[in-house]
Amino acid sequence: MIRIATEKDSCILAEMAVQMWENQTAEELAAEFAETIKDENSAFFIKSENDTAVGFAQCNLRTDYVEGTESSPVGYLEGIFVKEDYRSKGYARELLTACENWAKDMGCSEFASDCELSNTGSLYFHKAMGFDEVNRIICFKKSII
C-alpha cells in the first residue's frame, strides 16, 4: 500500500532517509520533514508492506529553472528510498508513479530528478524509469576572504 505521509510520519520517514542522506541525523531530518509536509508544494509517499513502512519518496514542485525542462512548475523527485530487504519488488516504481501522479494533479507537465555522479544505482533506476539524462556537472567553490 502507498499512502501520502502526514506530520505524524516524520520520524518514520527520517529513519529511512538517514540511510540515504548520511550527512544529517534522523532528528534533523524528522524536524525538517515535519515542516516540509505542511507545504502544499511538497508531498511524501510511504510504501508499506504488512503495516511496516518499507520505503518512501519525497517530491516537490519547483518553479525555479530545472535543468532540461521547458515548463513551470516542474514536479521534482527529491529523494526515493526502499529498504534493502524490500528491493527488486517494484516498490520504487510504485513510489515514483505516486509522485508523478501528484505532480500531474498539481498541474505539471514535466517531472525531473537528479543524483550524484557517483550514484550508479540511482542513475540506472532513473534510466529504467524513463528519465532522460540532460546534464552532468561538477560544482566548485573557493573562499575569497
Whereabouts are the PLM-identified features?
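A short beta-loop-alpha structural element at the N-terminal edge
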Residues: 1-13
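Helix-loop element at the rim of GNAT/NAT acetyltransferase active sites that forms part
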Residues: 14-28
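Active-site rim helix/loop that mediates acceptor-substrate recognition in acyltransferases
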Residues: 25-48, 58
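Conserved beta-strand in the GNAT
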Residues: 46, 52-61, 76, 81
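Glycine-rich acetyl-CoA-binding "A-motif" of GNAT/NAT acetyltransferases
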Residues: 51-55, 91, 121
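Conserved acetyl-CoA pyrophosphate-binding loop and the N-cap/start of the following alpha-helix
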Residues: 86, 90-98
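Conserved active-site alpha-helix within GNAT-family acetyltransferase domains
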Residues: 93, 105, 117-136
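Conserved GNAT acetyl-CoA-binding A-motif
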Residues: 96, 103-115
